[in-house]
Amino acid sequence: MLLALILLSAAPADIIDRIAVSVGDRVITTSDLDREIRVTAFLNGIQPDFSPATKRTTAERMIDQKLVELEMENGRYPTPPLESILPALDDFQKRFYPDPAGYQHALAAYGITDDDVKKELLWQRTLLEFIDVRFRPGVQVTDQQIQDYFDKVVAPAATAAHPGQTPALAAYRDQIEQTLAGQREDEQMETWLRDARRRTEIMVHDEALQ
């Protein structure tokens, strides 16, 4: 089957960018896929992997992103401002690229821009806020669940780390509640994504993932 094609008018020549995935009326192009792989590798400090397996995994993640974007638009969810991720970007640069010239050199080596990095960090923050707003109100963590997690996970680890000391639930309660709430949110998110995929016409062009 022939792949759908898009002409990139911004290119100096007629460069053809193939559609890799269609999600409803949205598309993910091969250049979108390529850029996502590069930016993710840059943030993780590894070399980009353009194997079919990585392209497939990246495409699946980008499908989820499109589904969330559609839900946010339809539900009029708030989007965090770009300024909200600048502290995280600053921390990243200070940790890995304290020299501004080194940061720019690394961007060039990965074939990406500072804007690409900012967009990725903004999306990560947007996703976290979406999950929190969309699913946290329905999450309930019971006292028994907190006690069970403490007995099975926290107490053994704390005892091993501090022999001779008896860990107290009160010292870990808030942390345990946050952990369990986060797990419940993730579970609800996975369920929602499965339902959203069933409701949405998704077409993957396997040829573009080779």
Where are these regions (language model features)?
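Peptidyl-prolyl cis-trans isomerase
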Residues: I15-S22, P52-Q210
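Sec-dependent N-terminal signal peptides
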Residues: M1-A10
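Boundary of Sec targeting at the N-terminus
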Residues: S9-D14, R26
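N-terminal targeting signals for Sec/Tat export/insertion, comprising classic cleavable signal peptides
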Residues: D17-P48
